[in-house]
């Protein structure tokens, strides 16, 4: 894919919100270049809100360019105020350092999981250079290039200042200087020519372009990605239970897969463009095939498979699909211990119990019945299954527990709960 094809593809996918002149970008990227995107450590894992910039780095990688993932070990100690309603809570240095390590490992694994050469990705920590800066030198050499008038006129800052109950601290106000310095440093050390980021980062990116020109005498470029919203206008990326994480110990591959599988018909083709490497022609073929198909579209399954494979690999995808099929068929007997652990994490309502607990009580505590009377009716009508076997007795749990610890309760075809026996060694 040549440079013109790369940027045409990005535009067709709707992945460019703002940029420096595209003609200059196309010309610049006609030869191999270096680009970067920053990720501040605000938790021990990235979430799906980080996927579009990660995949953008990957798209440039696949076109023969070198990607830098910058982990903000320094900037993460401050927090970006851009379009935030309140001052960020400051985390301890030890916490931030651990998160930096976690994110660096996670990003490296994601960006090299498809078999590419590790040399095409560089993960760096801006604490390695910002931590060595002398304060007076920074004010003299960097601070003098920033106009306070221009900084307070940024929309992201004006919104905070306009709120009578909120101001902005000097700590957060200085964030833009540090991010700008990152760009200048990466340009000087690695020849970095492009910074990408979310649409809320445009002001910081432009400041970095200006500072790089002043410090290094070099013209560099910037590009932002759109804010991803659903068809109803709401921000995409969270569920009722919170963020959807990329780390399997925080969001299981099964729950991750289900999240994409439940994409709305009005969103799914756009999401295929944003979150997969399928060509726009292939996506249009899927759309047309779905329009002719009687029944459920295939686009959601294709989306879920591609994104889950990218984040969790073939093994994670296979596990998510096995769990999905097991719950659909009602036969959970072939699930592995690790797959049942996924259901315990976030796949099903989970209730701790002992073997002597009444099934009536468990149906109540799990939410499968609203009263003992209703629970008895479900049992008498043969609507309750335990580990796939129909049960009509009210007594305690009996029979074979999966891996001596789990029972899957099922009411009807679609209502499930997981029972975990207490007091077992993990």
Swiss-Prot record:
S4 RNA-binding domain segment(s): 357-421
Top-level taxonomic group: Bacteria
Chain sites annotated for binding ATP: 238
A Pfam cross-reference name: tRNA-synt_1b
Intervals of motif 'KMSKS' region: 235-239
SUPFAM superfamilies, sorted: Alpha-L RNA-binding motif, Nucleotidylyl transferase
Sites where the protein binds L-tyrosine: 36, 175, 179
Record motif 'HIGH' region, residues: 41-50
NCBIfam families, sorted: tyrS
Protein's job: Catalyzes the attachment of tyrosine to tRNA(Tyr) in a two-step reaction: tyrosine is first activated by ATP to form Tyr-AMP and then transferred to the acceptor end of tRNA(Tyr).
Protein family according to the UniProt entry: Belongs to the class-I aminoacyl-tRNA synthetase family. TyrS type 1 subfamily.
PANTHER family: TYROSINE--TRNA LIGASE, MITOCHONDRIAL, TYROSYL-TRNA SYNTHETASE
Protein name per its UniProtKB record: Tyrosine--tRNA ligase 1
Lineage: Bacteria, Pseudomonadati, Pseudomonadota, Gammaproteobacteria, Vibrionales
Primary gene name: tyrS1
């Amino acid at each position: 894919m040549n440079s013109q094809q790369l940027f045409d593809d990005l535009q067709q996918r709707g992945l460019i919100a703002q940029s420096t002149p595209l003609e200059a970008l196309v010309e610049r990227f006609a030869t191999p270049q270096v680009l970067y995107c920053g990720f501040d450590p605000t938790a021990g894992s990235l979430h799906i809100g980080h996927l579009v910039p990660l995949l953008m780095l990957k798209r440039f990688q696949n076109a023969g360019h070198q990607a830098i993932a910058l982990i903000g070990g320094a900037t993460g100690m401050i927090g970006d105020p851009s379009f935030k309603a309140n001052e960020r809570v400051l985390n301890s240095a030890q916490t931030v350092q651990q998160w930096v390590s976690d994110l660096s490992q996670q990003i490296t694994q994601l960006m090299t999981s498809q078999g590419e050469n590790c040399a095409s990705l560089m993960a760096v920590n801006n604490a390695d250079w910002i931590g060595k800066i002398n304060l007076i030198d920074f004010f003299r050499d960097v601070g003098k290039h920033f106009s306070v008038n221009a900084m307070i006129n940024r929309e992201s800052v004006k919104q905070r200042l306009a709120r009578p109950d909120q101001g902005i601290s000097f700590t957060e106000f200085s964030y833009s200087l540090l991010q700008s310095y990152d760009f200048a440093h990466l340009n000087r050390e690695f020849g970095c020519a492009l910074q990408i980021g979310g649409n809320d980062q445009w002001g910081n990116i432009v400041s970095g372009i200006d500072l790089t020109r002043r410090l290094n005498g070099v013209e560099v470029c910037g590009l932002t990605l759109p804010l991803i919203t659903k068809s109803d206008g709401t921000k995409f990326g969270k569920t009722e239970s919170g963020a959807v994480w990329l780390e399997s110990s925080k969001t299981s591959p099964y729950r991750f897969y289900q999240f994409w599988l439940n994409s709305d018909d009005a969103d799914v083709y756009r999401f295929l463009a944003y979150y997969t490497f399928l060509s726009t022609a292939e996506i249009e073929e899927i759309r047309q095939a779905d329009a002719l198909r009687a029944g459920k579209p295939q686009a959601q399954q294709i989306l879920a498979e591609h994104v889950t494979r990218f984040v969790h690999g073939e093994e994670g995808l296979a596990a998510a699909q096995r769990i999905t099929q097991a719950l659909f068929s009602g036969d959970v007997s072939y699930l592995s211990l690790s797959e049942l652990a996924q259901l315990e994490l976030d796949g099903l309502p989970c209730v701790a119990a002992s073997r002597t607990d009444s099934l009536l009580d468990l149906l109540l505590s799990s939410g499968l019945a609203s009263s003992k009377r209703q629970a008895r009716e479900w049992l008498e009508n043969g609507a309750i299954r335990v580990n796939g076997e129909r049960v009509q007795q009210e007594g305690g749990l009996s029979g074979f527990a999966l891996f001596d610890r789990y029972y899957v309760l099922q009411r009807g075809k679609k209502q499930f709960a997981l029972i975990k026996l207490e007091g077992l060694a993990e």
